[in-house]
């Protein structure tokens, strides 16, 4: 939504107020009518508070249509308008502890004044505390216990009729429980979507190749306001009751707590995360306790709500133009905020993953000042269309790493620059490569790159690699941080005096590690290949490479086509191996490891190539149990006939041989239309008879 009007300075209060009203009304329309919010809550709150203060300082600037004089957005087209019997007001907000102390003082003073006890000492005010859900407020009307209508808040006076959609929410009773029910009951509450349900909904959206929802609140709002209630019925919406509008035919409960207990008796869903406290100290204690468990709650909340518990005290306190005096929303530090993206750098992870990182103008969000945020990967940057110079939405929730959620396209400067993934690692200068079908680009300097140093050393020392006993993570940390070891080759240059000086490393430990290093010099080619840490090359593939080529040099010099001839090596693995050995830095470290006095292994001739048999060039997959042949025997016969026996079914598979209890491989073959043979069919195939 375009915001082209220039932002006036504070020195022009008339123009500034008009601009603020325009910004807030545009945001209201996007939020309530389009269900496409384009301003973070914190930014909206900041603009709203500024307009409130401006109108307080300059009362002549207050207009009837100012956002400060109303509750929300106008009813959208497509739904029948509903006039609320009692207005659905919003709440004033508090952010700092001082705001809560001031609220409690205002309430206590007003109650004292209302009872002609001004200046006297009174007991602390009793409050009902509950959660502030991040969903959509609605009103439910029951007549003689039967659900008859549901409406959204709208502008607080007039909302939208969403009765048919709300009927699909299973947690909302269509008839109240109990024999004694009110003639009319107007229940106020929140429609929301639990985190687990939101995740499942987006999984379905992805599977159907449909647009995913940004967050549970957007999903709940969009689902509730569907013109087709059948769509709403497929969305996992929930509801919590927390307030009341109109009540006829029964007396009003004496306290807010009693009201919620009453609702539970009627079968209405009420949240159990609530408490009764006294005074400001009790309010702040509730806020802190909820904050500690916030991330573990099964739904999103953006704060807590405090309400004077006694109904008679609520009535004495009354209302201001847009909110009750007896209640306050205590909001958590904003989890989203706006700031400017000044640059995009890349960061190298311990496994070589290249991650774009946004460098930001400092912004306070989620309780901390944020200057950097992850952009995940190159595809995410493209998908979100994030550019250098953009005004971006930054999200930080709990201990989660800050991330850039999106950019405000209407604020994009003309010179905003697209991100370009570098071709060389910023740490070591090695080539950056991205394998087909992978979202992550990686530095190929695995043995050399300082950013990957600790991971490379740890992997090299693993039991299934060179098995260097005594070289654990803490020792590796010291060796790297003291700059004693940069590559695996440096391990074999370590001396007794150097090791003995390490923290918590006695002479015996030093000698034991030296003995392990000496032992590790005599290994096998398969262990050495595995120890190099080549991506996608596990222990089994390392053995296949060693068996196929016989020595290291042919592997290092092999083309992708030659690598594809190795058993169980597919295009992605072949590309990964080829990239690793194509990087000159890796070859240098390998030569250092093979230097005299360093690592050795017995080498042999390459495995003889299978003669061109009847199945030369064919790929066969075995699955299940054959009646007379073991898996190994069948594999040996197929390989002798020139076939490649693969471990998984793909479009490149020519035949699948299936025995008893064949599983997913058989299903995959049938799905792809690949010929499936039994044991007799296998024998015919080996005899040259194509099924």
Swiss-Prot record:
<keyword id="KW-0479">Metal-binding</keyword>
<dbReference type="GO" id="GO:0006260">
    <property type="term" value="P:DNA replication"/>
</dbReference>
<dbReference type="InterPro" id="IPR013839">
    <property type="entry name" value="DNAligase_adenylation"/>
</dbReference>
<keyword id="KW-0520">NAD</keyword>
<dbReference type="InterPro" id="IPR004150">
    <property type="entry name" value="NAD_DNA_ligase_OB"/>
</dbReference>
<comment type="similarity">
    <text>Belongs to the NAD-dependent DNA ligase family. LigA subfamily.</text>
</comment>
<dbReference type="InterPro" id="IPR001679">
    <property type="entry name" value="DNA_ligase"/>
</dbReference>
<feature type="active site" description="N6-AMP-lysine intermediate">
    <location>
        <position position="132"/>
    </location>
</feature>
<feature type="binding site">
    <location>
        <position position="428"/>
    </location>
    <ligand>
        <name>Zn(2+)</name>
    </ligand>
</feature>
<keyword id="KW-0862">Zinc</keyword>
<feature type="binding site">
    <location>
        <position position="449"/>
    </location>
    <ligand>
        <name>Zn(2+)</name>
    </ligand>
</feature>
<keyword id="KW-0464">Manganese</keyword>
<feature type="binding site">
    <location>
        <position position="425"/>
    </location>
    <ligand>
        <name>Zn(2+)</name>
    </ligand>
</feature>
<feature type="binding site">
    <location>
        <begin position="90"/>
        <end position="91"/>
    </location>
    <ligand>
        <name>NAD(+)</name>
    </ligand>
</feature>
<feature type="binding site">
    <location>
        <begin position="41"/>
        <end position="45"/>
    </location>
    <ligand>
        <name>NAD(+)</name>
    </ligand>
</feature>
<feature type="binding site">
    <location>
        <position position="130"/>
    </location>
    <ligand>
        <name>NAD(+)</name>
    </ligand>
</feature>
<feature type="binding site">
    <location>
        <position position="307"/>
    </location>
    <ligand>
        <name>NAD(+)</name>
    </ligand>
</feature>
<dbReference type="Pfam" id="PF03119">
    <property type="entry name" value="DNA_ligase_ZBD"/>
</dbReference>
<feature type="binding site">
    <location>
        <position position="190"/>
    </location>
    <ligand>
        <name>NAD(+)</name>
    </ligand>
</feature>
<keyword id="KW-0460">Magnesium</keyword>
<feature type="binding site">
    <location>
        <position position="153"/>
    </location>
    <ligand>
        <name>NAD(+)</name>
    </ligand>
</feature>
<dbReference type="GO" id="GO:0006281">
    <property type="term" value="P:DNA repair"/>
</dbReference>
<keyword id="KW-0235">DNA replication</keyword>
<dbReference type="InterPro" id="IPR033136">
    <property type="entry name" value="DNA_ligase_CS"/>
</dbReference>
<dbReference type="InterPro" id="IPR041663">
    <property type="entry name" value="DisA/LigA_HHH"/>
</dbReference>
<dbReference type="Pfam" id="PF00533">
    <property type="entry name" value="BRCT"/>
</dbReference>
<keyword id="KW-0436">Ligase</keyword>
<keyword id="KW-0234">DNA repair</keyword>
<dbReference type="GO" id="GO:0005829">
    <property type="term" value="C:cytosol"/>
</dbReference>
<dbReference type="InterPro" id="IPR036420">
    <property type="entry name" value="BRCT_dom_sf"/>
</dbReference>
<feature type="binding site">
    <location>
        <position position="331"/>
    </location>
    <ligand>
        <name>NAD(+)</name>
    </ligand>
</feature>
<dbReference type="Pfam" id="PF03120">
    <property type="entry name" value="DNA_ligase_OB"/>
</dbReference>
<dbReference type="InterPro" id="IPR004149">
    <property type="entry name" value="Znf_DNAligase_C4"/>
</dbReference>
<dbReference type="Pfam" id="PF14520">
    <property type="entry name" value="HHH_5"/>
</dbReference>
<dbReference type="Pfam" id="PF22745">
    <property type="entry name" value="Nlig-Ia"/>
</dbReference>
<comment type="function">
    <text>DNA ligase that catalyzes the formation of phosphodiester linkages between 5'-phosphoryl and 3'-hydroxyl groups in double-stranded DNA using NAD as a coenzyme and as the energy source for the reaction. It is essential for DNA replication and repair of damaged DNA.</text>
</comment>
<dbReference type="InterPro" id="IPR001357">
    <property type="entry name" value="BRCT_dom"/>
</dbReference>
<dbReference type="InterPro" id="IPR012340">
    <property type="entry name" value="NA-bd_OB-fold"/>
</dbReference>
<dbReference type="InterPro" id="IPR010994">
    <property type="entry name" value="RuvA_2-like"/>
</dbReference>
<protein>
    <recommendedName>
        <fullName>DNA ligase</fullName>
        <ecNumber>6.5.1.2</ecNumber>
    </recommendedName>
</protein>
<dbReference type="InterPro" id="IPR018239">
    <property type="entry name" value="DNA_ligase_AS"/>
</dbReference>
<feature type="binding site">
    <location>
        <position position="443"/>
    </location>
    <ligand>
        <name>Zn(2+)</name>
    </ligand>
</feature>
